[in-house]
Amino acid sequence: MHSTIAYVFVSALALFAALHGSTSARNHTEDNSTEYYDYEEARCACPARHLNNTNGTVLKLLGCHYFCNGTLCTAPDGYPCYNLTAQQVRTLTTYPNTSCAVGVCMKGTCVKNGTMEQCFKTP
């Protein structure tokens, strides 16, 4: 009787393992795979500082690079940005006093799209 119960239990356990796989084997495969895990994206997972505007449109990055946990991160292509001079950046305040060139990030550069808007630091 005991051997029958043991046999049924072991068979059920084997069937479960076959259907669902071993947890340790599955985790091991996922941990070593770079196909599904973007390490660059993980290092750049903190929020980037954006500038506000008076138009009520989406907040935009100042340029296309930002630091996150000691890593220089690049915004993805097509991401909205402001293209400002160093002098404009130094004079930014928390109220709208700067006319900012609007653009989109392309390969790490904020490419102007010909429009301007008042931008300012978020409080």
Swiss-Prot record:
It holds the Pfam family EVA_Class_A. It is found in: Secreted. InterPro entries: EVA_Class_A (IPR045797). Residues 1-25 form the signal peptide. Glycans are attached at residues 27, 32, 52, 55, 69, 83, 97, 113. Salivary chemokine-binding protein which has chemokine-neutralizing activity and binds to host chemokines CCL1, CCL3, CCL3L1, CCL4, CCL4L1, CCL5, CCL7, CCL8, CCL13, CCL14, CCL15, CCL16, CCL17, CCL18, CCL19, CCL20, CCL21, CCL22, CCL23, CCL24, CCL27, XCL1, CX3CL1, CXCL1, CXCL2, CXCL4, CXCL5, CXCL6, CXCL7, CXCL9, CXCL12 and CXCL14. This is Evasin P1243.
